[in-house]
Amino acid sequence: MIGIDIVQIERIEQLIEKYGQKGLERFLLPQEMEVAKKPQTVAGFWAAKEAVAKALKTGIGKELGFHDIFIYKTEKGAPEFKLLNGKEQMFRIQQTALSISHDAGVAVAVAVIIRC
């Protein structure tokens, strides 16, 4: 299954300006906030979480929340994700792939998920 999302970086900048750290805590885990220092990185993480939720055909809501999706970077800087809080078993995840990019004022993410 494939999910994709795109977000304007300016939208994330406005969220940060208006709500600050509390705004970020609504959708980022503490470990993610350590990595996502720039608005374009935050926007990429937002898009990635939305893309994962779309790939699972659930969206963000009761079944899957922002804090159930952990976005991280490998040693080489490639983005990856894990589902937390038992969601990996619930959705029967076998294999995943994630790509995040940002350019021209937008961040885009594509998530690929293979289920058992």
From Swiss-Prot:
Primary localisation category: cytoplasm
Gene3D superfamilies to which the protein is assigned, alphabetical: 4'-phosphopantetheinyl transferase domain (3.90.470.20)
Substrates-to-products reaction catalysed: apo-[ACP] + CoA = holo-[ACP] + adenosine 3',5'-bisphosphate + H(+)
EC id: 2.7.8.7
Keyword terms: Cytoplasm, Fatty acid biosynthesis, Fatty acid metabolism, Lipid biosynthesis, Lipid metabolism, Magnesium, Metal-binding, Transferase
GO biological process: fatty acid biosynthetic process
Enzyme class per UniProt: transferase
Cofactor(s) in the UniProt record: Mg(2+)
Binding site for Mg(2+): D5, E50
InterPro entries for the chain: 4-PPantetheinyl_Trfase_dom, 4-PPantetheinyl_Trfase_dom_sf, ACPS, Ppantetheine-prot_Trfase_dom
Domain of life: Bacteria
Listed GO MF terms: holo-[acyl-carrier-protein] synthase activity; magnesium ion binding
Keyword Zinc: no
Record bears the keyword Magnesium: yes
GO cellular component: cytoplasm
Cell location: Cytoplasm
Function: Transfers the 4'-phosphopantetheine moiety from coenzyme A to a Ser of acyl-carrier-protein.
Family (UniProt): Belongs to the P-Pant transferase superfamily. AcpS family.
Name recorded for this polypeptide: Holo-[acyl-carrier-protein] synthase
Origin organism lineage: Bacteria, Pseudomonadati, Campylobacterota, Epsilonproteobacteria, Nautiliales
